[in-house]
Amino acid sequence: PVFSTKEETYELIVGKAKHIHSLSKEVIIPLEETVQPFRKINLVVRAFDDGIAFRYEFPKQKGWDSYIMYDEGTSFNLQGNPSVTTLFLPNYQSSHEGKYTVTDYADMDNKRLMDMPALFSFPNHVYMAITEAAVRDYAGMYLWKENGALLGKLSPKLGQERIKVEASLPHQSPWRVLMISDQIGSLIASNILTNLNEPCKIEDTSWIKPGKTTFTWWNGNVVPDTTFLGGNNFPTNKYYIDFVARNGLDYHSIYGNAEQAWYDEDGAGFGSPGPKADILKVVPSLNMQEICDYAKSQGVRIHLWTNWKPLYAKIDEAFAQFEKWGIAGMMIDFMDRDDQEMIRIQEEFLAKAAKHHLFVQFHGACKPSGLNRTYPNEFTREGTLNYEHCKWDKDTDADHDIHMPFTRLLAGATDYHLGGFRSLPRDKFKNQERNPYV
């Protein structure tokens, strides 16, 4: 084994703290097959004050160039009977928008997918969360209770269930992370996930500016006290741009109107773009350059919503056009997967967006894994049940809000719509598409 100490300081643009000091002890344990072809892998373990992480490295070596992984084989054998706070999922393709379950480990259902981070509260004030860091060119992992242990389950490649990862050497798995503390609040403050990611790849980050934005989809593009109809038009966007400027906000977000995106598409709505959807064709009622020019004159930056499919189909042309218009960033939606291909696509979005000075907000996406250190143009990820659901169901409540900081938010910045200005008691609550209640 090879032992070493890792110490570094770095800054985050989006994260739990601006200035981070990371200190850990590392051991690399080389492993080799005892029979031909004598393949070698390394088990790498790091210990921090606030947790432990391990990963598998597949070094470049003679006679072994690539691999196909059917199962990773990682398992966690917990002692005792902790209380578990987790989100059960029906399958690997998910928006991760569900309610958390609190149960004793002994009573927890077997053979059900558990989302990460999952929280384990032991007696005597010992708290542990299991998640992963630096998920890159790999499949996302879930937990699965079976035979008294928690098994790591990888998201399979599309169209089949057996193959999880295909890679050429050298390669490495994400870090499998156990966040540990005797104070539950310390889990929230932990920066272990960003500590385990590579340094920033963007040389000049001066253009990356998180801020507050309008959310016109939420209220249905209403334009109070006006004489025009709200929708996919310049007056509606001007109305909100003026509101942003007047109230000292930063961004105006453009989504579309009534399930019609701001770009040309022939599908059934925002989540189902048709085969002719074209991210480069703005609907005739909008002039994107005019909107961006007006916003710039008012000191307001523009943020676009888009479904990931038409955007990825023309990623290079679209990002170049966005930069030409003066767009600051995007909400990329309905990804709903974390198989190896989608993990690669997400990183490609971040890397190419950075070249065109665009920030990214992943919506309908898997959990963060600290990649906002490497690509600080990643602002937030959704993947949570939040108050946008008040438009169509009654699932959100105070208990869910309290679970969030100790589960999903442990992984990083979260796109969590929390509340609204029109509230009703639960016994009088009603779902409403425009001007919704909470």
Please state what every model-predicted region is.
Residues 73, 117-119, 241, 292, ...:
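Short amphipathic alpha-helical segments and helix-helix/interface helices
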Residues 25-27, 52, 72-74, 173-175, ...:
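Structural beta-strand/beta-sheet cores of well-ordered domains, especially the beta-sheet scaffolds
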Residues 42, 163-166, 239-241, 291, ...:
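Generic recognition of flexible, low-complexity loop/linker segments
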Residues 165-247, 251, 255:
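An acidic-aromatic substrate-binding cleft motif
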Residues 1-201:
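N-terminal accessory beta-strand-rich subdomains and adjacent acidic, glycine-rich linkers
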Residues 33, 47-49, 80, 181, ...:
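Short, flexible loop/turn elements at secondary-structure junctions
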Residues 256-436:
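Aromatic- and carboxylate-enriched substrate-binding clefts and catalytic-loop regions
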